[in-house]
């Protein structure tokens, strides 16, 4: 979202490469959130064994109060969860899957919309091949040492971890209300935010949860898990370019707009992103402050944009000229930007200092 152009032909390749890690991080954050909320999904025996069925408050203080117990939780639950997220689509690289995706001669666009039968076949091949890769390709690590007792404990522990990864991959295929949602919901979210499809539309990313809640209504995933992820990410994904109307201490709007970048998770309100400002007084800056952008000042919302459209065309042209040296080339984008592409800004190394001191 920051360094990758979001409006050219290379988007799909970059998104495909970034998606597994993006999904893995979201799965970790979602697991933490569900543990804090005391979700029934975290009461499955394997997970509960390592967090000792802690209450939400206890889980938040887990690392501080029980360093060894938390480290065990990381090794036995969190790392296997990351493995599952990273491996979830590894079966797509199986030759049979590649024949479907790319064609026998590699002549087809791998990011095209697949026919229903091809998609079903691909899902089956992916699952079988992923499990085979996990069990026969990776397997459990080998104990190195001379203690028979330690070896027995090590082998039993690693076998349980491997079975947990396998169970998560299986549960994510059709999770319904089960533990597989910890993988499935971030998978759906990532497939939209980092879409590889030709109809990818950056402007529509803040509507991602419309699709997720629709999936929940159809029984594809758990509504409560969708809601939990929504509270983590908010409506606006990290790295999204927000265009907003600044106002003074009396709440009076300025006759200009400014740019900001969504930089944090866990907004208090899902429609009020936590951002780092990228412009001040219509000039790009490399060190901005954190602000929460109220929906009443966010040009993403049509009502706010319509209200602000009372500005004259001359003033809007003036703003564009002050912000962009190539404003003539940007005219096709319109004078009233509802969002902005942050890669333009982050392509300059000095501007990457914007991340300094982010909480």
Predicted regions and their residues:
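Terminal helices and disordered tails flanking the catalytic cores of nucleotide-processing hydrolases
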Residues: 1-17, 21-24, 31-52, 107-113, ...
């Amino acid at each position: 979202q920051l360094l990758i152009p979001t409006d050219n032909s290379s988007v799909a390749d970059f998104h495909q490469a970034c998606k597994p890690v993006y999904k893995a991080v979201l799965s970790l954050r979602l697991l933490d959130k569900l543990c804090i909320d005391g979700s029934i999904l975290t009461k499955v025996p394997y997970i509960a064994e390592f967090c000792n069925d802690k209450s939400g408050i206890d889980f938040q203080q887990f690392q501080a109060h029980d360093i060894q117990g938390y480290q065990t939780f990381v090794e036995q639950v969190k790392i296997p969860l990351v493995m599952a997220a990273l491996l979830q689509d590894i079966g797509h690289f199986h030759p049979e899957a590649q024949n479907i995706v790319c064609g026998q001669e590699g002549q087809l666009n791998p990011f095209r919309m697949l026919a229903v039968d091809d998609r079903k076949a691909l899902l089956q091949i992916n699952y079988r091949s992923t499990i085979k890769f996990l069990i026969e390709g990776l397997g459990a690590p080998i104990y190195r040492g001379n203690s028979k007792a330690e070896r027995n404990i090590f082998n039993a522990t690693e076998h349980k971890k491997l079975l947990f990864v396998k169970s998560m991959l299986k549960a994510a295929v059709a999770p319904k209300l089960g533990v597989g949602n910890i993988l499935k919901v971030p998978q759906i979210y990532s497939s939209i935010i980092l879409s590889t499809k030709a109809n990818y539309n950056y402007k529509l990313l803040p509507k991602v949860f419309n699709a997720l809640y629709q999936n929940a209504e159809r029984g594809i995933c758990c509504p409560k898990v969708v809601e939990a992820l929504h509270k983590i990410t908010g409506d606006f994904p990290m790295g999204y370019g927000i265009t907003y109307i600044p106002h003074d201490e009396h709440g009076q709007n300025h006759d200009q707009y400014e740019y900001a970048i969504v930089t944090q998770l866990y907004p208090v309100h899902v429609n009020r992103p936590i951002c780092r400002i990228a412009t001040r007084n219509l000039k790009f800056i490399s060190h901005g402050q954190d602000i929460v952008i109220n929906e009443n000042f966010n040009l993403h919302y049509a009502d706010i944009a319509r209200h602000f459209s009372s500005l004259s065309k001359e003033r809007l042209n003036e703003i564009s000229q002050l912000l962009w040296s190539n404003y003539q080339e940007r005219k096709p984008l319109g004078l009233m930007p509802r969002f902005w592409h942050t890669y333009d800004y982050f392509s300059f190394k000095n501007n990457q200092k914007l991340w300094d001191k982010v909480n």
